[in-house]
Amino acid sequence: MPIMLNFSNGRILPESEVEALRNVARSNQSDVLLVGSRSLRLHHISFMDGFSVEPIPGSFLDRIGERRHRRLAESLERQLNGGSSFLQAFSQYIEQTSSAPPLQESVRNEVQSRVNSYAFSVNPGDFPCSVLHLSCPITLCVPETGVFVKNARCSKVCSLYDISALTEMLRRNASHPLSREAFTPGMIVHKEECNFNTTEQHFCILPRSDTRL
């Protein structure tokens, strides 16, 4: 059931309300918030005890006010993360916990170049799956700009990542969040090389593209 929230952009919620929201998110992992006529989705990222908030697209009038809708989500997200955006909190977490051996600069640059080349604007309607399968493993939100990444170096299963979150991981020399391996260029997959398997309910690499990777 959606949570009704009396909140507007620029308003500071009492700490008791902020903590109550955190606790609800910790219990449910994901919740829908109703702020007036606008809907937001709140996610709890348990491995770092962080919170991300994304606007849920609605009517045509909502889309006209998309910028205000996003600012509302960002304002609430900062309050839930103690003043930081989710990406800032994630960056701090990576800095504190990263223990991966440093990638050679040439390899890191090649991975980042491939990320930039393969990134695309995400339109959920283009995929034969629910938005659940389009959620970034880091932010738990559907990215505006995303890129497919293998779940492990030798895996044929892929997940969609938010390009900003992935770029931050590379900048911080963090390991792959699922396999804990160092990132390699071959882990970054072009959109056209991925197919959603409706039987197994995940994205996988098309057989004809194996030789490219």
Swiss-Prot record:
Changing residue 138 to K: Loss of ubiquitin ligase activity, increases interaction with host GOPC. Does not fully complement the deletion mutant. It is found in: Secreted; Host cytoplasm. Its EC number is 2.3.2.27. InterPro entries: Effector_NleG, Effector_NleG_sf. Effector proteins function to alter host cell physiology and promote bacterial survival in host tissues. This protein is an E3 ubiquitin-protein ligase that probably interferes with the host's ubiquitination pathway and targets host proteins for proteasomal degradation. Mice infected with a strain of bacteria deleted for this gene had an increased survival rate. Can be ubiquitinylated, and ubiquitinate ubiquitin, giving rise to polyubiquitin chains (in vitro). It comes from Citrobacter rodentium. Interacts with PDZ domain of host GOPC via NleG8's C-terminal residues. GO terms for biological process: biological process involved in symbiotic interaction. A motif (PDZ-binding motif) lies at residues 211-213. The keyword GTP-binding does not apply. Disruption phenotype: Slight reduction in diarrhea in C3H/HeJ mice, no change in bacterial colonization, but higher survival rate. It catalyses: S-ubiquitinyl-[E2 ubiquitin-conjugating enzyme]-L-cysteine + [acceptor protein]-L-lysine = [E2 ubiquitin-conjugating enzyme]-L-cysteine + N(6)-ubiquitinyl-[acceptor protein]-L-lysine. Belongs to the NleG E3 ligase family. The keyword Heme does not apply. This is E3 ubiquitin-protein ligase NleG8. GO terms for molecular function: ubiquitin-protein transferase activity. Induction: Transcribed for 2-5 hours after treatment that induces type 3 secretion system expression.
